[in-house]
Curated annotation (Swiss-Prot):
Function: NDH-1 shuttles electrons from an unknown electron donor, via FMN and iron-sulfur (Fe-S) centers, to quinones in the respiratory and/or the photosynthetic chain. The immediate electron acceptor for the enzyme in this species is believed to be plastoquinone. Couples the redox reaction to proton translocation, and thus conserves the redox energy in a proton gradient.
Record's bilayer topology term: Multi-pass membrane protein
Family per record: Belongs to the complex I subunit 1 family.
One MF annotation (Gene Ontology) recorded for this entry: quinone binding
Species for this entry: Synechocystis sp. (strain ATCC 27184 / PCC 6803 / Kazusa)
Protein name according to UniProt: NAD(P)H-quinone oxidoreductase subunit 1
Pfam family, one: NADHdh
Taxon lineage: Bacteria, Bacillati, Cyanobacteriota, Cyanophyceae, Synechococcales
């Protein structure tokens, strides 16, 4: 039973029902996925920023944002508006072109990665057969922007922050990719839709987190390092580097770094839920739910309900992971740069390689359980 509806065809048929010719209806559809992607990612970031401020305040026995809207929900909007109207300062001896291009290279690849994130069986902007490979490729572009920003600022703290960001990304990109390869090996596909389909049918018992417990931990640690979350926020360690590669930035360029960081955090949580937590899959098999309700699985209202439940489950799983990441910020102390690199190269990399080899052996030995 499919967990979704065909958004594109439904939208085109609705427009044609209003009398629009097919060509004009397709013209309306073309920019819609990009607009939805940008709006959805931005709203997700605003929610995460508010959650982080409230959860951080609760961890420190404070109230947190309170006056900007009910419970302070409009505080991220107020902060964003403030940064938009602040003066854009470029240091006198900085390279203006690289200084401007750096933040763009940080944000743009992360937004493009949302193209392959599925919220339901057909609720995905672009279902390409190399979706996960595209995400890994795009995620490797952002460190270039960070290094470029640090170098172009003509500031020693910015340069050190940029170098740390590049070293950190390279160190953890490889274990993360190896953990993803183990999932790809089990699902026999690089498509995010196929990876979720491979986990469906058995509810929570079919999720990859049970077959890949080591890969799940490797991916989570590497994802936190890629997002530069504590305890891996060395590129912008305020006690050592003022603000790292962000030191010389102000106004909207400064806001782009924070936007990129939080958008990347939401993206990592979404990809994590797709790879290990069944994506839009419900903890109870939806076939069983249909049987309990006494309706056919192909009933139209049940299909719409499944699509809504799929979106809800994907978002809930992702925000649960974000909640854990926020708690870790106030629980675990920052590591040193040598500890960071040792963890990536001397521990996570060999463990990820061993996990990949063990997954290959289990796939050959138990093909039914491991996607043979």
């Amino acid at each position: 039973m499919t967990s979704g509806i065909d958004l594109q065809n439904s939208f085109l048929q609705s427009l044609q029902g209003f009398g629009l010719p097919p060509g004009l209806a397709k013209l309306f559809w073309i920019p819609l996925p990009s607009i939805l992607m940008i709006i959805g990612a931005t709203v997700g970031v605003l929610v995460v920023v508010w959650l982080e401020r409230k959860i951080s305040a609760a961890a420190q026995q404070r109230i947190g944002p309170e006056y900007a809207g009910p419970l302070g929900v409009l505080q991220p909007v107020a902060d964003g508006i403030k940064l938009v109207f602040k003066e854009d300062v470029v240091p006198a001896k900085a390279d203006p072109w690289l200084f401007t291009l750096g933040p763009v290279l940080v944000v743009l690849p992360v937004f493009l990665s949302y193209l392959i994130v599925p919220f339901g069986q057909n609720l995905v902007i672009t279902d390409i057969n190399v979706g996960i490979f595209l995400w890994i490729a795009l995620s490797s572009i952002a460190p270039i922007g960070l290094l470029m920003s640090g170098y172009a600022s003509n500031n020693k703290y910015s340069l050190l922050g940029g170098l740390r960001a590049a070293a950190q990304s390279i160190s953890y990109e490889i274990p993360l990719s190896l953990a993803v390869l183990a999932i790809v090996m089990m699902s026999n596909s690089l498509s995010t839709i196929d990876i979720v389909d491979q986990q469906s049918g058995y509810g929570i018992l079919g999720w990859n987190i049970w077959r890949q417990p080591v890969g799940f931990l490797i991916f989570w640690i590497a994802a936190l390092a890629e997002c530069e979350r504590l305890p891996f926020d060395l590129p912008e360690a305020e006690e050592e580097l003022v603000a790292g590669y962000q030191t010389e930035y102000a106004g909207m360029k400064f806001a782009l770094f924070y936007l990129g960081s939080y958008v990347n955090l939401v993206l990592s949580a979404l990809v994590f839920s797709v790879l290990y937590l069944g994506g839009w899959d419900f903890p109870i098999p939806l076939e069983n739910v249909a049987n309990w309700l006494g309706v056919a699985p192909t009933t139209s209202w049940l299909q719409v309900l499944m699509a809504a439940l799929g979106i809800t489950m994907t978002v809930l799983k992702s925000y649960f992971l974000i909640f854990i990441a926020i708690l870790l910020r106030w629980t675990v102390p920052r590591v040193r740069i040598d500890q960071l690199l040792n963890l990536g190269w001397k521990f996570l990399l060999p463990v990820a390689l061993a996990n990949l080899l063990i997954t290959a052996a289990l796939k050959l030995t138990f093909p039914m359980a491991f996607g043979g």
